[in-house]
Amino acid sequence: MKIIPSIASASQLDLKCQLDRIRDVPYIHIDVEDGNFLPNITFGMKTVKEMAAYSKAELDVHLLTTNPIKYIQELSKSGISAVCGHMEALPYPLEFLHEVRQAGMKAGLALNLSMPIEQVMSYIGSFDYLLLMTSEPDGCSQRFRSCALERIRRARACIPDEVIIYADGGIGRDELGKVAEAGADCVVMGRAVWGAEDPAKAWKEMETLNGYGTDSKAFRNI
């Protein structure tokens, strides 16, 4: 199981400095929030492009926006590896998935806790990964919800093995074992990484804990 730091949880005062702190981490997760789908605003396309140009890591983008499809071309030009959009914001999911793949990126669907797993079943074969929120992405406490574990189990049982399952939201060290056992391939971690004095060291400790990170799926291996 791979541990992927979320740059949105780092200090935003000097992103270059924050990227330097995790320069040896091979994967970074970028949340793009537009202030409409969620009340919070994170990164614009210019900032994403600059981060992609500066970092040597493989970057995936999680679009928490009301119109995910409009970002695809700019993200592709920035060298992003993978993009997912929320089912709640996609009136035509196949159009989104097709455009992401046509742009040369891995395509994903994201689900909030309230969205049934069954909503993605008819799109199997059209997406490369599924991101399951494990907290409410409301910008408040973002506490891990234990009910998400059963959702991960159900998704893993229903979805082909080649589809990567992401778990994202409120996950700390105490939840890692449970999330791994439920069947997640990748875990997005924010405060658990960036709240440490040395984020890279914290990432490495969690990546190697009980073998996490060993024989894990990665986008370059799909």
Tell what function each PLM region has:
Residues C17-D20, N67-K77, S114-G125, I171-V187:
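Catalytic cores of alpha/beta
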Residues V83-P91, L131-Q142, A182-W203:
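Glycine-rich phosphate-binding active-site loops on the catalytic face of alpha/beta enzymes
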Residues H29-I30, D34-E99:
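N-terminal active-site wall of soluble small-molecule enzyme domains
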Residues I41-V61, E99-N112, A148-Y166, E205-D215:
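Alpha-helix-loop-beta-strand connector modules within alpha/beta enzyme cores
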Residues K2-I7, I28-I30, L59-L63, V83-G85, ...:
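Hydrophobic faces of well-ordered beta-strands that scaffold small-molecule active sites
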Residues V100, A180, W194-I222:
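C-terminal helical cap(s) of enzyme catalytic domains, especially alpha/beta-barrels
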Residues L15, D31, L75, L130, ...:
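Conserved, mostly hydrophobic/aromatic
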Residues D34-T42, K46, L113, M121-R153, ...:
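Glycine/Thr-rich beta-alpha phosphate-binding loop at enzyme active sites
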